[in-house]
Amino acid sequence: EILTNSGHEVEEIFDPFKRLGEIITVKILKVHKPEDLKEVVVCEVTDGKDFFTVLTTAKDQVKPNLIVALAKPGSFTFTHQKVETKEIRKYVSQGMFLSPFEAGISEEKNKLLTFEEGTPLGKSIYEVLNLSEPVLEVAITPNRGDLLSIYGIARELNLICNWELKPLEFGDDLKGGKVFP
């Protein structure tokens, strides 16, 4: 509203995590290794109300009582992969366990996103992690190229509202004119 009232058009405000769909915390109840599936285990999980079956190749990481992130059918991973109900032989997977990378919260790709014992079940993982990253989409006019960065928007808000503006700080690897490899 402040930017709009000062003549800058805010086209949209959105939370990219909410666009992903239903990604919730679930507890693994049972892990079963069927003889007719080589690299996959069948996990029975609950969100505290309902029960789901999930097939996963992370067989060395899953165990009973572990709380993990489940992307339900119809949701998307942070890498834009749509999660669907899948059937392998006679087994049906009702979602997908996510790594921190697939959930969009870190670069770790080779492990499941797990939570501490006692974490509420059936809640959005982003709510549990207290993550909310609203994104402003601002229409920039040709004469206001200084607003093309987050720092430029912060400087503008500093001028309009007299809010404190912290100076930009760079790590030692960016000081002194070093060139990136």
Residue ranges and their predicted role:
Residues 1-174:
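Phosphate-backbone binding interfaces of nucleic-acid-interacting proteins
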Residues 177-181:
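Short, intrinsically disordered, charge-balanced linker/junction segments flanking boundaries
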